[in-house]
A protein has these predicted regions:
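Sec-dependent N-terminal signal peptides
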Residues: 4-13
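Bacterial Sec-pathway N-terminal export signals of envelope proteins
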Residues: 20-73, 79, 223, 230-268, ...
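Acidic, low-complexity, intrinsically disordered peripheral segments
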Residues: 20-22, 30, 223, 432-459
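Short flexible linkers and secondary-structure junctions
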Residues: 22-144, 285, 289, 308, ...
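Small/polar, glycine/serine/threonine/aspartate-rich low-complexity segments that form flexible
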Residues: 23-25, 71-105, 233-241, 275, ...
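Sec/SRP-type N-terminal targeting helices
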Residues: 44-48, 61, 107-135, 160, ...
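Periplasmic alpha-helical coiled-coil/stalk elements that build and connect Gram-negative outer-membrane
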Residues: 137-252, 380, 384, 404, ...
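A short glycine-centered flexible hinge/capping loop motif at secondary-structure junctions
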Residues: 177-181, 409-413, 450
Length: 459
């Protein structure tokens, strides 16, 4: 029992220590992105695909080497067996061996092997670029989820602040009601407002929990329990100018974005497919080489003696001697000409041309997709910056208006309905400001990312 209890205690303390460590750690955006890239299943699958393309490239190079294959046969014969010495059948059981070693070397096949090597090089590059594209997409998704947490965190704080103000107002209104300064209806309306804000706060906290869950799922973590992120201090200068125009950013991004480069590589691959298909029209020249020998247990060796009655005298023919004496080797050349093969070569060439056109359209589509993404991000960044600047003014105005309304409410000059309306307008203005702030941050980070700048909230 003691032997069983000790390992269990160790496991419990280890788990507790791990959980405590996770609770103490706060994840930055850079750490989240790195962890996601290291643990994402889609990335791991693409790594395997890249290794697969690497093997294809290596195999295409090895195909230039000559082939060499060996074969060994051992057979038994019963009753009537051909005597290889006299070429007559004898009534005798026997055994025989045959050994063969041969292969071939491709000398010319329309440069198909060389074009296959070059094609596989570009396929490997395309696979590596696809891997980088997946990493980039995951990085952007992580950044969006991270900023969503920051936004929801600010909304929770804003809602909680409004609730605390309402609770303080309940106490003031209670005293005024006890003193007979206000009617009970005023107190009930403020209490109803507090209940509404408590429900709103619960909803905001639920949204925050969901945003944490979303991020931890992207990170492939088992649970969001104990997971926290760094809350950076982010300030926005409303007078800032977004550097670069859409066309300038697009020109820069074309040479950086892996999806564009991958589409270019795939177009090149299709062009080599056409060269390979055309190579099938060429004659094929190969060199063949072989070496063989054999052994038979019933074969006899002429001793050099001739009996006057029976004729030539034969003796045992040892295995090693037969193998040596029967050794045969040589080489030759083979030339084949494709003449008529059901128009397969012509159809393959036609299909390769169609494939080239398809990949050209694919490249054009990727460029248009990138341009539209940059165009949309640029427009969204400008709009959110303007919205943020306007919301700053709105919040300042609403805060001043609310202070004035609150002062009047405290002396009974404003009804609870007007007071609650002022609070609601202030909270909405604060929420709009937070949403515009993080939308602007994300869109500018997307534009910087297209320029080759790593995702980082500290910049």
């Amino acid at each position: 029992m003691k032997k069983l209890l000790f390992p269990i205690i160790i496991i419990i303390f280890s788990a507790a220590e791990t959980g405590f460590s996770q609770q103490q750690k706060e994840w930055s955006l850079v750490e989240c992105i790195k962890y996601a890239i290291d643990n994402n299943i889609q990335i791991k699958q693409q790594v395997l695909q890249t290794q697969f393309q690497q093997n294809n490239l290596e195999q295409s190079k090895l195909n230039l080497l000559p082939t060499l294959n060996g074969r060994a046969d051992h057979s038994y014969s019963f009753n009537r067996t051909l005597d290889q010495t006299t070429y007559q059948y004898v009534d005798q059981n026997g055994q025989s061996n045959q050994f063969y070693l041969g292969g071939s070397l491709n000398l010319f096949n329309g440069l198909q092997n060389y074009n296959t090597i070059r094609k596989n090089k570009y396929q490997l590059l395309a696979s590596e670029l696809d891997l980088q594209s997946i990493k980039d997409n995951i990085s952007l998704s992580i950044a969006l989820a991270y900023l969503q947490i920051l936004l929801n965190n600010e909304l929770v704080k804003a809602t909680d602040n409004q609730l605390q103000i309402t609770k303080q107002q309940i106490q003031k209104t209670q005293k005024m009601f006890d003193a007979g300064s206000v009617a009970k209806g005023n107190l009930l309306q403020i209490e109803a407002q507090a209940a509404s804000e408590e429900m709103q706060l619960i909803n905001m906290k639920n949204q925050l929990d969901i945003s944490y869950l979303t991020l931890t799922q992207m990170l492939e973590l088992q649970s969001p329990e104990g997971f926290n992120i760094v809350i950076p201090e982010i300030s926005i200068d409303t007078n800032m100018v977004i550097t670069g125009k859409v066309d300038d950013i697009f020109s820069q991004a074309q040479g950086l974005r892996p999806e564009i480069k991958s589409a270019e590589m795939n177009l090149t691959v299709s062009e080599f497919d056409l060269k390979i298909a055309r190579g099938a029209r060429s004659p094929r020249l190969s060199m063949n080489h072989s070496m063989s020998t054999m052994y038979s247990s019933i074969r006899k060796k002429y001793t050099g003696v001739i009996d006057s009655i029976t004729g030539p005298v034969y003796g045992e023919y040892p295995f090693n001697d037969q193998i040596k004496d029967n050794l045969n080797y040589g080489f030759g050349f083979s030339l084949s000409l494709p003449i008529l093969n059901g128009w397969q070569v012509n159809k393959n060439i036609s299909n390769s041309k169609i494939s080239i056109d398809n990949y050209r359209y694919n490249l054009e589509g990727e460029k248009k997709k990138l341009y539209k993404s940059i165009q949309q991000a640029y427009a969204d960044a400008l709009a959110s910056l303007k919205k943020f600047a306007a919301s700053l003014k709105a919040v300042a105005s609403m805060e001043e208006s609310f202070r004035y309304t609150e002062q009047k409410f405290n002396v009974g000059m404003v009804t609870p309905v007007d007071y609650n309306a002022a609070k609601t307008q202030l909270l909405k203005a604060q929420s709009d400001m937070s949403q515009a702030k993080y939308e602007f941050i994300f869109k500018t980070k997307v534009l910087d990312f297209y320029k080759g700048v790593p995702l980082n909230l500290n910049q």
